[in-house]
Amino acid sequence: MEETRAGRYIVRAGSGGQTEDTASGAESVLATLAAVRTRRRSVVCDGPPGSPTDSARHMSDLASLALTAEFGLGCLEAYVRINAGQVLPVVWPPGWNLVLQEIETDEDFKPEDVKAWSHYLCCQTRLAFVGRFVNEGVLSPDQQKKTAVCLISDEGYVFCYVREDTAVYYLARNLMEFARVGLRAVETLHCMRYLTSSLVKRYFRPLLRAWSLGLDTMARFIIRHHGQFMPLTYPPGTELRLCNLRCFENSVEGGHLLRNIKTAFGMRVLGLGTVSLKGENAPFPHLRWPVDLIPIVVAYTGAVYACDVRDDRYIRVGDNLNTFMCLGLNLLFENRRFSGHNGIYDRVPDCPKGRQHR
């Protein structure tokens, strides 16, 4: 890997990078982008932080970053070098920002770390370090501090590495899509503070309170409230019907699934209830277990799992009840977490390139 200095930045020659012959071209591209940014900012008048004009200015900066990424990782790294320290607000979660930064100046990570993270993904991909995601707000009781960095692939896909999760999350197909969705794919960032449905919060609070008092208290709560319906955030219109799942454990089709997960966790697993994907919440009246009636269990670790009778396996739908409350069954249908050491109960991560991996 050779490095060629071009003006105020370094252009790297290597796989997917810039060559010495294109260094001047990259410099020309950056000069053009700088002129475009200047023209855009001259149109947008100054305003106080948080004002519409301030938001438009930040969108202009993000659009410039997105345009640079289209010219390759060499130009992108040069842009980050020139604009190091620039702060770009993230649309979600509130109070989070992307701070542009070079990997060489980062105190915790090195270039070889970025290369190691690329091996988490399902396909061979080169990643570029763009900066850190920083939370300016005060953490709520159900939040944990996260060390998150922004990564962009040679094809323009946006990823996020979270050190506490030891995982890389696939965020968006490009930076402009990222501008609309933010960090929503990072499941561990979801918490009660960011949940907009007051109805879901109201129904889940007693359940969370029972869980905080221990597994036995949780078991008694489920028996006491057997048959109660609790709204879920996803899929829209679905509800969790509280049940200890004795009916499922005794069924022919799926009973072995519950017995297997109890064996895996030393019997310390509670049946939480069922979710009908058809929206029909009648009690279980069939001789055979319907494939669209999803049993939900919670392990002593707090992780929540859905039993998929069709594929004869159970899938993690939340690292804890808080995450399950915020995401519903989202992880049953979509998984964007690429983990370096676990994930055997996860749905197969969705390949950014659209390939099928099993």
Swiss-Prot record:
**Where in the cell is the protein located?**
Virion tegument
The keyword Cell inner membrane is annotated on this UniProt entry: no
Regions that span the bilayer: none
- Can you name a GO cellular component term? host cell viral assembly compartment
Q: Which UniProt keywords apply?
A: Virion, Virion tegument
- One Pfam family this sequence matches: US22
Plastid: present as a keyword of the record? no
* Entry's family note: Belongs to the herpesviridae US22 family.
* Entry protein name: Tegument protein UL24
Organism source for this protein?
Human cytomegalovirus (strain Merlin) (HHV-5)
Instruction: Give the taxonomic lineage as stored in the record.
Output: Viruses, Duplodnaviria, Heunggongvirae, Peploviricota, Herviviricetes
Gene this protein is translated from:
UL24
